[in-house]
Structures are given as C-alpha cells and as structure tokens.
Amino acid sequence: MNRLNCLAAAGALCALFVQPVFAQTVKVTPLGGIDGEFCAQDRALVFEDPNGTRVLYDPGHTVAGGGDPRLGRIDVILLSHMHNDHLGEAHIKAAGAGTCAKPDISVATPQSNVVDIALAKKSKIVTGSEMPPFFAARLKAGGGDPANSMLARFGGSVTVGGVKIATVAALHSNGVDPLFIEGELGKEMKAAGLAGDVGPATGYVLRFSNGLVAYLSGDTGILADQQLVVRDYYHASLVVMNMGDGFTTGPAEAAYVVNELVKPASVIPSHANEIGTVDGKLRPGSKTEAFVKAVKMPAYVPLSGHTMEFDAAGKCAAGC
C-alpha cells in the first residue's frame, strides 16, 4: 500500500471512530400521568447523557415511586423547589391511573416521592438554597446515605456522572408543606396556614458531555437573569419552560422569555396545569397551544413516554 493509500485508510479509520462522538445526543423522556399525552400534573423528565448518566427532574406526582418501571437507573434527581407537585407528597398508583385531567394520586409518601426514589435507586439529590439538609435527614431516616444530598447554590455547580449541574434563580415561592414537619410544630404550622422556609426556588442549567446546555426553568416568572446568566453566560440552547399561568409565567410571558431573553434553538413547554393534548395532539384553545404558536423556535410538547433526542446545538435529532 503506497503512502497516499495509507493516509486515506487512516483517515477513514479516524472518521469511523470520531463521527459517532459528534452524532451523540441527549435523550429526554417525559414521565407523565397518561402515556402519549401532556397532562395537568406532568412535571417529570428524565435526561440521559450520551455517556449513560440519567437525571430525573421534578418527579412530582406522576412518577409511581421508586418502583416505577419507566425510571430505569437514575443517577441524580433534581428538584427545583419544595411544592408538592414537584416534590411529591403522594404519587400515582401506576402510569395511566386516573385521567389526564385528574390522575389517581392516592399513594402517600411521608418522606416525599423524591426521597423514596432516591433510596430505591441510590441516587444523588442535587438542590440549591437551604434544601439539602431536608433531604439529608430523610435519606438518613430511610437507611440511605445523607451525603447523597448535594448542594449547588447560585453561582456554583457540581458534576455528577459527567453532567455539570448549576442552579440559577427562579422567581417563585418555596414553602415546605407542614405535613413534612414532624410533631407539634408541624400541626401548629398547618393550623396557622404557614409553610416552612428553605430559601429561594431554583432553576437549573445542565451541561451534558456532548456539549448541549439545557435550561430547566423550574417554576418562575420573568427574570433579567434569563438573559444575563442563562443566555449570556451559559449559552443555553434547549429550554424547558413553565407556561401554565397563575402560579408561573403564562403562555405569553413564557414565550417572551424564550423569544427575547434566552433565545434557544428549541423549547419544551412544562407545568401546563391543564389537559395540553388529546390523542397526542395539541388541544385547541389550550394554553399549551397558545405557547407553541407564540414561540419563534421549534416547540416540542412533552408526551409522556415518548423520547426526544437533542444534539449539542439544542436541535431535535429524533423523536420530535
């Protein structure tokens, strides 16, 4: 074989091994109440890095505890804030239990769904503000390792399984339901209509091993940080954006955030608090439809159980 042929063969061999690295994608799988739909209580998403690391975000009510067969391995759980629809004071009996409008959330979780899943999967829990001690105590009480409750406060980050996790500001309340506070104090707080304080709510910015940067808004309003931090510093190209109104930004406000402040390549609506789809299609007149129509970039509705794949630039490569 002459020198040119050797070089050509070497180049082809390099291409064989290098090309898949650039083709790697992050998989995003919604874990909602009804397969193939986007429903009122749906919050949970699983992100799978190309290296296999799996991140569960805001499991809430629609993950059926640590034994939910949809979970698979979970390396880290992210919780944006302590409200029950994200933390999970109870969960569905199984995927498909109840209806899209009213899932059967009848299985109580005294230590929270987040903790039950973390114990079952031996997962890390990454939170910000003053939330980590809450989870450390409950992991210990359940026979787990309290060190698995990890802190990533504003401006800082931690890396788990090759995924870099940073917390960013969210404009939202963050009270702990008194049912998670034991003894007379919890009873008195409940009677007074008070919640525990664990500091500000958070969003997350994730940097995956393929280079994709994703912004998970949590529950929030409009913030200057969505441009100054999320866009200008982190350069997020995929956004998961709450748009349910009342408790968070509504469709118009959420569209403003992604259109004018973050400007990602793609967006996934979240926290609709409504029946967003019927038979897997946008429900006419819904807030979800209004948001999808208002954004300037592709919006991909998170249909439960349907995996989407995103490349390093935040563009959908499959499943959308």
Feature map (PLM): residue ranges:
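Extracytoplasmic/secreted envelope proteins and their assembly/folding machinery
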Residues: A44, S112-V115, P132, P251, ...
